[in-house]
Amino acid sequence: MEIPAIQTEREDITSEKMAQINPLPVPLGPWKITVYDQENFQGKRMEFTSSCANIMECGFDNIRSLKVECGAWIGYEHTSFCGQQFVLERGEYPRWDAWSGSNAYHIERLMSFRPICSANHEESKLVIFEKENFIGRQRELCDDYPSLQAMGWGNNEVGSMKVQCGAWVCYQYPGYRGYQYILESDHHGGEYKHWREWGSHAQTFQIQSIRRIQQ
């Protein structure tokens, strides 16, 4: 649906401006996201094909709605890719609760984002370990699991993980609820030895559901 011109201010991102905004070297790929400073795709909008470490440098005080047109992305609560993580797959997100999903935490901020370069839904493989540093009982995952306990994991914690292919999103609670942790095969060499490596917001080993990220 076309946004009325009186309500929309569109700005194209030049390569020079993106070089200032984006501190991460990201290879060219099929990624495109459009962000808006008002809910329901209203207000100022801006298109990106690469990462943005601080949306305030683009004249936004926050992102209140967005559309993912190509690829998969990670949104972050704070600037510089910090705080809670939100997986953003292809589709429309008219309000903050559309990307936070059934997260039990009320977080309306989304201040930085980047593409998930390794997402490959058809060829994804993850190995989870009972204890940190890849010790103890292990299990190889190649599918989506709304409940690790139901598939026989036996407890509500995961000590460490190795992403062998693709990208995954892990959730604190069953049914894809709670904090989100995005794990990628091209970050940390695909190895996450301790919960502290899952993200700056991670505080616990608790993971009870896991799924592949859709490209």
Curated annotation (Swiss-Prot):
Q: What ranges does the record give for the region Connecting peptide, renumbered to this chain?
A: 118-123
| Entry annotated with the keyword Repeat | yes
| Changes after translation | The N-terminus is blocked.
Q: Which domain of life is it from?
A: Eukaryota
Q: Which InterPro entries match?
A: Beta/Gamma-Crystallin, Beta/gamma_crystallin, G_crystallin-like
Q: Where is this region: N-terminal arm?
A: 1-30
UniProt keywords (A-Z) are:
Eye lens protein, Repeat
What Gene Ontology terms for biological process does this UniProt record contain?
lens development in camera-type eye; visual perception
Entry's SMART domains?
A: XTALbg
GO MF terms here are: structural constituent of eye lens
Q: Which residues form the Beta/gamma crystallin 'Greek key' domain?
A: 31-70, 71-117, 124-165, 166-214
Is Repeat set as a keyword in this record? yes
Gene3D superfamilies referenced in this protein's UniProt entry, alphabetically: Crystallins
Comment text on domains: Has a two-domain beta-structure, folded into four very similar Greek key motifs.
> What's the family?
Belongs to the beta/gamma-crystallin family.
Q: What does this protein do?
A: Crystallins are the dominant structural components of the vertebrate eye lens.
PANTHER family, per database record: BETA-CRYSTALLIN A3, BETA/GAMMA CRYSTALLIN
How this chain assembles, per its entry, is:
Homo/heterodimer, or complexes of higher-order. The structure of beta-crystallin oligomers seems to be stabilized through interactions between the N-terminal arms.
Name by which UniProt lists this protein: Beta-crystallin A3-2
- Origin species: Aquarana catesbeiana
